[in-house]
Amino acid sequence: MQVILLDKVANLGSLGDQVNVKAGYARNFLVPQGKAVPATKKNVEFFEARRAELEAKLADVLTAAEARATKIKELGSVTIASKAGDEGKLFGSIGTRDIADAVTAAGVDIAKSEVRLPNGVLRTIGEHVVSFQVHSDVFAELNVVVVAEA
């Protein structure tokens, strides 16, 4: 199925590309999320007329994401208190939701889906480097300090 991309899609293309994808991927993911439209004659003409507007909108989103990434980097570190045993192991773990809540409380709005934990959830006290993907092209890193609750 031919579609026109309205946004940058990983491993597929960027704004304005006409790509061939499986029908189910287009119907169930790309079109409902507003990332693509079917490549009919009418849609191709409509897209070409609005191309500059869509590119400007995409640039604005990228600029906003870069500003959020800068705010995250300016935080330096975020401290999270959790119950822990004597050897420094946590009772439970600290996951993406806990980190997103702590960063949001520190003043930068972050969704839990933007938090990236490549080594899995945090299970020990100490400093951990956590990365955030605020846009498909924009990443930020932040130190998360896990301390034992008194």
From Swiss-Prot:
Function comment: Binds to the 23S rRNA.
Family: Belongs to the bacterial ribosomal protein bL9 family.
Pfam name, any one: Ribosomal_L9_C
Statement: the UniProt record of this protein carries the keyword ATP-binding: no
Family matches, as PANTHER family: 50S RIBOSOMAL PROTEIN L9 (PTHR21368)
A GO BP entry: translation
Protein name: Large ribosomal subunit protein bL9
UniProt xrefs under InterPro entries: Ribosomal_bL9, Ribosomal_bL9/RNase_H1_N, Ribosomal_bL9_bac/chp, Ribosomal_bL9_C, Ribosomal_bL9_C_sf, Ribosomal_bL9_N, Ribosomal_bL9_N_sf
GO molecular function, one term: structural constituent of ribosome
Keyword Lipoprotein: no
GO cellular component: ribonucleoprotein complex; ribosome
Annotated keywords: Ribonucleoprotein, Ribosomal protein, RNA-binding, rRNA-binding
Top-level taxon of origin: Bacteria
Gene3D superfamilies on file: Ribosomal protein L9, C-terminal domain, Ribosomal protein L9, N-terminal domain
Species in which this protein is naturally found: Pectobacterium atrosepticum (strain SCRI 1043 / ATCC BAA-672) (Erwinia carotovora subsp. atroseptica)
NCBIfam families: L9 (TIGR00158)
Transmembrane segments: none
